[in-house]
């Protein structure tokens, strides 16, 4: 997963974000269309999306609330990473850190997306799914992102596979936000390629989850050893 420099990025987008064209207000439309492509084709180009947010900073009359929320949702799918916060910091203070009296639709949306992202970054996966299901607004905010829930599940599974050799089935089911054992088993076996044995999910050994014996070695040269002996002799004298 490379959300910073994806292979799907076309040359004309690369020319915009790497050249002076990134300051041209007319480039906003091109970058917006490219964001739509990302949402439909399930890839993410955070670099290009930040270029669009920077254009919005310079040209506030061009701001589109739906584009901002789509950028944040796409950045969220890159967890754990700083991508969401990097995008958030390009919004105005009233949007990214609204006060208690803020009531605009965008500030409310940003606040809710921040909460979701914090739960993913904190590995509070079961809580994330509960929050996502708690308000219809979340469905509205993610509706443009094709396969959003599946992308989150796959990413959670990748992180689990890097950390565990086995995990309790009910725990993983809650982390994946799946509500029945049949769907969970299908995801585990077909998408992840793991095995279910009773209430335990067996995860194959890989470079990340393999237990390694820690080897601690200290090289002590003759001079260091001599100083220790001398100090011990002086203290006992």
Swiss-Prot record:
Residue ranges of domain PCI in the record: 44-219
Q: Where in the cell is it found?
A: Cytoplasm
Q: Which UniProt keywords apply?
A: Cytoplasm, Initiation factor, Protein biosynthesis
Q: Please name the GO terms that the record assigns under molecular function.
A: ribosome binding; RNA binding; translation initiation factor activity
GO BP annotations of the record are: formation of cytoplasmic translation initiation complex; regulation of translational initiation
Kindly list the residue ranges recorded as spanning the membrane: none
UniProt superkingdom: Eukaryota
May I have one GO cellular component term? eukaryotic 43S preinitiation complex
Which Pfam families does the entry mention?
CSN8_PSD8_EIF3K (PF10075)
The protein's job, in short, is:
Component of the eukaryotic translation initiation factor 3 (eIF-3) complex, which is involved in protein synthesis of a specialized repertoire of mRNAs and, together with other initiation factors, stimulates binding of mRNA and methionyl-tRNAi to the 40S ribosome. The eIF-3 complex specifically targets and initiates translation of a subset of mRNAs involved in cell proliferation.
Q: Which family does it belong to?
A: Belongs to the eIF-3 subunit K family.
PANTHER family attached here? EUKARYOTIC TRANSLATION INITIATION FACTOR 3 SUBUNIT 11, EUKARYOTIC TRANSLATION INITIATION FACTOR 3 SUBUNIT K
Q: How does it assemble?
A: Component of the eukaryotic translation initiation factor 3 (eIF-3) complex.
Q: Please report the name of this protein according to its UniProt entry.
A: Eukaryotic translation initiation factor 3 subunit K
């Amino acid at each position: 997963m490379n959300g910073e420099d994806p292979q799907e990025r076309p040359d004309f987008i690369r020319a915009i974000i790497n050249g002076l064209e990134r300051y041209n207000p007319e480039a906003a439309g091109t970058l917006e269309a490219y964001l739509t492509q990302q949402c439909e084709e399930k890839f993410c180009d955070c670099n290009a999306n930040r270029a669009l947010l920077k254009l919005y900073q310079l040209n506030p009359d061009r701001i589109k609330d739906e584009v901002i929320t789509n950028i944040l949702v796409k950045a969220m799918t890159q967890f754990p990473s700083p991508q969401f916060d990097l995008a958030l910091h390009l919004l105005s203070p009233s949007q990214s850190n609204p006060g208690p009296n803020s009531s605009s639709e965008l500030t409310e949306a940003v606040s809710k997306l921040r909460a979701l992202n914090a739960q993913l970054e904190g590995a509070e996966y079961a809580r994330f799914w509960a929050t996502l299901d708690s308000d219809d607004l979340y469905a509205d905010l993610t509706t443009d992102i094709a396969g959003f829930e599946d992308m989150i599940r796959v990413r959670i599974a990748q992180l689990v596979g890097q950390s565990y050799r086995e995990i309790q089935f009910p725990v993983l089911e809650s982390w994946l936000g799946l509500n029945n054992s049949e769907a969970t088993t299908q995801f585990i076996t077909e998408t992840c390629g793991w095995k279910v044995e009773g209430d335990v999910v067996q995860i194959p050994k890989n470079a990340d989850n393999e237990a390694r014996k820690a080897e601690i070695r200290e090289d002590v040269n003759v001079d260091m050893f001599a100083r220790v002996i001398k100090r011990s002799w002086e203290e006992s004298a």
